[in-house]
């Protein structure tokens, strides 16, 4: 009985090994091709989809942008015949049913069609060789870059593009940035409430994703071109009176709504020509809401206006502090607006202007009590130096004003260090 079981098991094992095994070709994948000779197609990747087997064949894929033809490549002579031959990169995606027949015919023809190209840096190198002799056993080494040769993207990037390792679309000198429709720009709250021991400085967040400092410069020609005198009734100056934009005589008890004030109006345009955003000196949670003008004031004193006597340099009109809503009104070509007059995005980007026309509230000096004569209009931006700048010597504009009692003429507006 024991002999019978042994004989039965032996026959089953022999059947499993010899007779009962199905043809190996029915379950085995198509054999891989042997190592290709130099210049032939090589199988890189093989996969199956919907019952069909696909192969990725290549002589060595690489990307080469269009460049000038090398004059020595087509020059006749023995030297050209012995020059290193670079195989032309071709990348094919074919069905494996017809790939076997085409590989045998396409290999020699593609190798013969290879043309020498000038040596250059390449973005992607796979199976690339600068020599005509290529060992079949080094197909894996072809996919690696030599230690001394570092692939670069220099021939793919737009010219003069600046690398940015900060927040998305943040480089002010990058004309290819996209910030208009980018919801993640300035995603981090740089105006969070400072914690004890924090190293925040005035202008919260300027050192977080920017390099350098801002530099505000007022436009003297903009002021000189649009300075004029206007008379307005007190009932039209209620919001201005609320923000202390008038002389002290306007707040007397005997002043009526139909009394007029004489205003020296002028515009202002401030440019940030630095390398960092000019951000408000106050954190966002302390911004003040002004119901008359329906916006937040993020700085107590962004500008200061004074009227000085031309001979004595004494103040003849009561200047006032102008606290504005900072925003990018316009920008130079290649720059984009990134700040607006809202509750959380106030500031001034590099290469952009914050413009205040002469017809808006508080863009004036109340000269109701000033006599006709020659004066100096002094306009200062960031007068208290609350926000760090790279240069404070260009923050003041001085203009010569000739006031006749009904008209004012501005001339000689220049940047001044004081």
Curated annotation (Swiss-Prot):
Contains 1 lysine tyrosylquinone. Residues 21-169 form a propeptide. Residues 214-418 are annotated as: Lysyl-oxidase like. GO terms for biological process: blood vessel morphogenesis; collagen fibril organization; peptidyl-lysine oxidation; platelet-derived growth factor receptor-beta signaling pathway. The record marks 219-220 as: Cleavage. Its cofactor is Cu cation; lysine tyrosylquinone residue. One of its GO terms (molecular function) is protein-lysine 6-oxidase activity. The lysine tyrosylquinone cross-link (LTQ) is generated by condensation of the epsilon-amino group of a lysine with a topaquinone produced by oxidation of tyrosine. Proteolytically cleaved by BMP1 which removes the propeptide. Also proteolytically cleaved by ADAMTS2 and ADAMTS14, but not by ADAMTS3, at an additional cleavage site downstream of the BMP1 cleavage site. The propeptide plays a role in directing the deposition of this enzyme to elastic fibers, via interaction with tropoelastin. Cleavage by BMP1 to remove the propeptide does not increase enzymatic activity but increases binding to collagen. Cleavage by ADAMTS2 produces a form with reduced collagen-binding activity. Keywords: Copper, Disulfide bond, Glycoprotein, LTQ, Metal-binding, Oxidoreductase, Secreted, Signal, Sulfation, TPQ. InterPro entries: LOX-like_protein, Lysyl_oxidase, Lysyl_oxidase_CS. It catalyses: L-lysyl-[protein] + O2 + H2O = (S)-2-amino-6-oxohexanoyl-[protein] + H2O2 + NH4(+). The propeptide plays a role in directing the deposition of this enzyme to elastic fibers, via interaction with tropoelastin. Interacts with MFAP4. Interacts (via propeptide) with EFEMP2; this interaction is strong and facilitates formation of ternary complexes with ELN during elastic fiber assembly; this interaction limits interaction of EFEMP2 with FBLN5. This is Protein-lysine 6-oxidase. It comes from Bos taurus (Bovine). The lineage of its organism: Eukaryota, Metazoa, Chordata, Craniata, Vertebrata. The gene is LOX.
């Amino acid at each position: 009985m024991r002999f019978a079981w042994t004989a039965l098991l032996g026959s089953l094992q022999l059947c499993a090994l010899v007779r009962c095994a199905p043809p190996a070709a029915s379950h085995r994948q198509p054999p891989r091709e042997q190592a290709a000779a130099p210049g032939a197609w090589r199988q890189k990747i093989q996969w199956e989809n919907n019952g069909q087997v696909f192969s990725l064949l290549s002589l060595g894929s690489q990307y080469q942008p269009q460049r000038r033809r090398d004059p020595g490549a087509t020059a006749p002579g023995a030297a050209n015949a012995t020059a290193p031959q670079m195989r032309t990169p071709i990348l094919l995606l074919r069905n494996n049913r017809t790939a076997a027949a085409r590989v045998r015919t396409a290999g020699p023809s593609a190798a013969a069609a290879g043309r020498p190209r000038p040596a250059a840096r390449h973005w992607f190198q796979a199976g690339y060789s600068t020599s005509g002799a290529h060992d079949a056993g080094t197909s894996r080494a072809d996919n690696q870059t030599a230690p001394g040769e570092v692939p670069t993207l220099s021939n793919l990037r737009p010219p003069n593009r600046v690398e940015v390792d900060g927040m998305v679309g943040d480089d002010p000198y990058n004309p290819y940035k996209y910030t208009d429709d980018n919801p993640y720009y300035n995603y981090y709250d740089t105006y969070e409430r400072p914690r004890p021991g924090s190293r925040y400085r005035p202008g919260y967040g300027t050192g977080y994703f920017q390099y350098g400092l801002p530099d505000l410069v007022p436009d003297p020609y903009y002021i000189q071109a649009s300075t004029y005198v206007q008379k307005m009734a007190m009932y039209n100056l209620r919001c201005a009176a609320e923000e202390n934009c008038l002389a002290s005589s306007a707040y007397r008890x005997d002043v009526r709504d139909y009394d007029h004030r004489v205003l020296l109006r002028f515009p202002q345009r401030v440019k940030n020509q630095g390398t960092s955003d000019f951000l408000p000196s106050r954190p966002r949670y302390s911004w003040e809401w002004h119901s008359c003008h329906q916006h937040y004031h993020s700085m107590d004193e962004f500008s200061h206006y004074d009227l000085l006597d031309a001979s004595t340099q004494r103040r003849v009109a009561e200047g006032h502090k102008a606290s504005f809503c900072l925003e990018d009104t316009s920008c130079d070509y290649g720059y984009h607006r990134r700040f607006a007059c809202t509750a959380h995005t106030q500031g001034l980007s590099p290469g952009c202007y914050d413009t205040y026309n002469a017809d808006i509230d508080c863009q004036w000096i109340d000269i109701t009590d000033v006599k006709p004569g020659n004066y100096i209009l002094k306009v200062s931006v960031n007068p208290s130096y609350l926000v760090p700048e790279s240069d404070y010597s260009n923050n003041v504009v001085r203009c010569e004003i000739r006031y006749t009692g009904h008209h004012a003429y501005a001339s000689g507006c220049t940047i001044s260090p004081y």
